[in-house]
Amino acid sequence: LYRGHQPMCKKKEGNTYAIILNGEIYNMKTLKEQLIKEGEMFSTTSDTEVVLTGYIRYGISYIEELNGIFSIALWDGKRKKLYLIRDRVGVKPLFYTKRGDTLIFASEIKGLFAYPGVKPVINREGLCEIFGLGPAKSYGKGVFKDIYEVLPGHFLEYDRDGLKDHAYWE
C-alpha cells in the first residue's frame, strides 16, 4: 500500500474526495494515459489515484470505464455522498449494514462485527439457502441478519436521502 497511500484523499476547488480501493484495475495504464492527455497529473503509480482522479473529472459514470477486480469506497465531499462500488462479476467482496443513520461497510463480514452494536445474528432464510444450494448462494443474501453485499456490477449511493442501489453493468 505504500504506493497507493490508502485511504487516499484529494482536494479540488475546496472539496475533499477520498477513496479506498481493494483490487486491481487491469486497464489502469490506458486510463491514466488518457487522463494525462486531458491535463491531469499524478503523484503515485497506484490504481487508486487513477480511479479517484477519473471520478473527480467525470463523476460516478467513470466506473463504467474500469476493467478489473475491485471493491471501492469513495467519498465525494462536494456532493456529500458515499459510493460503495463492486467489480462487474463480484470477485472482490463488499459487505454493508446500517445502524440508524450510519452505514458500516467492509470487505470482510468480520469487519462489520468489529463495529459496536453489529452482532452475528443468523438469518434463517440465508442459512437454508446455503444448505439447499451449498456452497453457492444468491448474491445479496447471506447467513447473517441485516448484513448485505453490494451486488456485482452495482454501486450504492449513500447520502442524507438514504441508500440507493444502482446497476452500472449487466
What are these regions (language model features)?
Residues L1-E170:
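Cysteine-centered catalytic environments shared across enzyme families
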